[in-house]
Regions:
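Short, flexible helix-loop junctions that flank or precede catalytic/ligand sites
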Residues: 1-290
Length: 290
C-alpha cells in the first residue's frame, strides 16, 4: 500500500489492531505532504435492527439466485448493509460465500457457511479477474464490492443468470437511476439486450443515505424496490423512468420510495422537516405532505 501511495499519490486499504478495532483508510498526497481519512470498523458486526436496517432489506438474503444491488453515495453505509446480508446467509444457510472487496472491511467467521474473502490487489488482480475466477470456485453467493465497468457488470449479470446470488453496490441514488446507469454503461447496440437480461436477473435495488436525526446522530433512510412483473416489463420496454411512480404509489410492505421513507421518519419524530426537505427527491411534493 505504501508503494502504491508513493507511486499513484493515493491508495485505499484496511488493517486491524488486535483487541481494539479494524480500520479502513484512504491515504493521499496534498500540497507535498501525506494525508489520510480513517474510518473505524468494529470487529463485531452490529445487528441490523441496531443499525436501522429494515427487515425487508435483510430478507433479501433469502434469494438463492439473481442480482441484489445496494446503492447510495460514498459513506452511506452500503458496505455495512451488504455485510449484514452476508452475515444472515452465513448464519442460516450452508453456502459457499465469496466476497470480492477493495479493501476488506468486515471480517466474517465461518458459521453455517464457508466465507472466502478476497481483497483486490492483494489476493487477486482486479474485480473482473476475481469475478471470473469465482465462477470456477463453486460459489452459492458472490459479494462484489463494486461494479466499475461494463465487463464486470456483464459478468455479474451472467453469474446471477446461471444460478448464483450476486450482491453488489453502485454509487447511484434511486432504483430508476441505478437501472439506467447500468444500461447506459453499454454501447447503444447492446443496450436492448442488456435491458432484457437485467429485467430477468434483477431481484431488488436498495438505495440508502445517512441523514441527521433530531439528536444529531446519523441514521439511514431507505428506498426499496423489489422486482415485480410490471417493473420487469418497464425495464424490458425502455420505460425505466416510470419505475419511480410504481415505487412511490406502491401499497406493498416490501417497497417504499425514499421520500415516503423520509416522511415516515419525520412523522415518527426522528428527523426535522428541514432534514426531510434537504434529502428528498421531490421537494414540492414533500412540502405538501409535511
Amino acid at each position: 500500500s505504501i508503494d502504491l501511495l508513493l507511486q499513484r499519490g493515493d491508495d485505499d486499504f484496511s488493517f486491524s489492531i488486535p483487541g481494539l478495532s479494524r480500520y479502513r483508510v484512504s491515504t493521499y498526497k496534498q500540497r507535498g505532504s501525506l494525508a489520510a481519512v480513517i474510518r473505524v470498523i468494529t470487529f463485531e458486526l452490529p445487528k441490523p435492527d441496531e443499525l436501522g436496517i429494515p427487515d425487508t432489506v435483510v430478507q433479501l438474503s433469502d434469494y438463492t439466485k439473481g442480482l441484489v444491488l445496494v446503492t447510495g453515495p460514498a459513506g452511506s453505509g452500503k458496505s455495512t448493509t451488504l455485510a449484514c446480508l452476508v452475515d444472515r446467509i452465513n448464519s442460516t444457510k450452508s453456502d459457499h460465500i465469496i466476497t470480492l472487496e477493495d479493501p476488506l472491511e468486515f471480517l466474517h467467521r465461518h458459521k453455517k457457511s464457508i466465507v472466502s474473502q478476497r481483497e483486490i490487489s492483494i489476493d487477486t488482480e482486479n474485480y473482473l479477474v476475481a469475478l471470473r475466477a469465482a465462477l470456477r470456485q463453486s460459489p452459492d453467493v458472490i459479494l462484489l464490492g463494486e461494479m466499475r465497468d461494463y465487463e464486470t457488470i456483464q459478468t455479474a449479470m451472467t453469474a446471477a443468470e446461471t444460478g448464483h446470488l450476486v450482491l453488489s453496490s453502485l454509487h447511484t441514488i434511486g432504483a430508476a437511476n441505478t437501472i439506467s446507469r447500468i444500461i447506459d454503461v453499454f454501447e447503444p447496440n447492446q443496450q436492448r439486450q442488456i435491458a432484457v437480461q437485467l429485467s430477468m436477473v434483477l431481484k431488488a435495488v436498495v438505495s440508502q443515505q445517512l441523514i441527521p436525526d433530531t439528536n444529531g446522530r446519523m441514521i439511514p433512510a431507505f428506498e426499496i424496490m423489489v422486482m415485480t412483473p410490471a417493473i420487469s416489463n418497464m425495464i424490458r420496454d425502455n420505460k425505466v423512468h416510470q419505475i419511480d411512480g410504481i415505487i412511490y404509489t406502491s401499497a406493498k410492505e416490501d417497497m417504499i420510495s425514499m421520500d415516503n421513507s423520509l416522511l415516515g421518519l419525520y412523522k415518527a419524530g426522528r428527523i426535522t422537516s428541514e432534514t426531510a426537505l434537504r434529502y428528498c427527491t421531490n421537494p414540492e411534493m414533500m412540502r405538501k405532505k409535511l
